[in-house]
């Protein structure tokens, strides 16, 4: 049976999931796109995942690697979309080079802002105004438009204005 390895990049980093095999997190410095093996535990996580990629590819069971990447909500939305795509590109090149897998089996999806990850982090925290932040994350659309199609409000705006921006 062929196996599919999934690779997820989350928030300022990434989550690697090898279906039925293993998982690992890859982190990025804020605003950066290049894989940095010296940042946090990236070296250990990448070495382990690359070993799995090599093994699965060597046995012919590796069918596909999917990279999904995200960025934190700070900064402009368009820049976060571009950053998440560039992180996916960078990681693909890194995996192809170090694991020796063909680039044709790697697909990428830059997802922009990691709203779900932010929600999980807030829910697990003891931060001030946690309930209000969760309410905004759960009930406010990313963008709110007026009748003319202009953006008049949104999730990020409400978060930044919550309690006077504290």
Question: Predicted regions span which residues?
Answer:
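Short secondary-structure boundary/capping segments
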Residues: 1-3, 82-83, 122-126
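Glycine- and acidic-rich phosphate- and metal-coordinating loops
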Residues: 64-71
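Soluble non-cytosolic domains of exported or imported proteins
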Residues: 40-44, 74-89
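Periplasmic OmpA/Pal-like peptidoglycan-binding modules at the C-termini of bacterial envelope proteins
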Residues: 20-40, 44, 52-64, 97, ...
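Cysteine-centered nucleophilic/redox motifs
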Residues: 67, 83-99
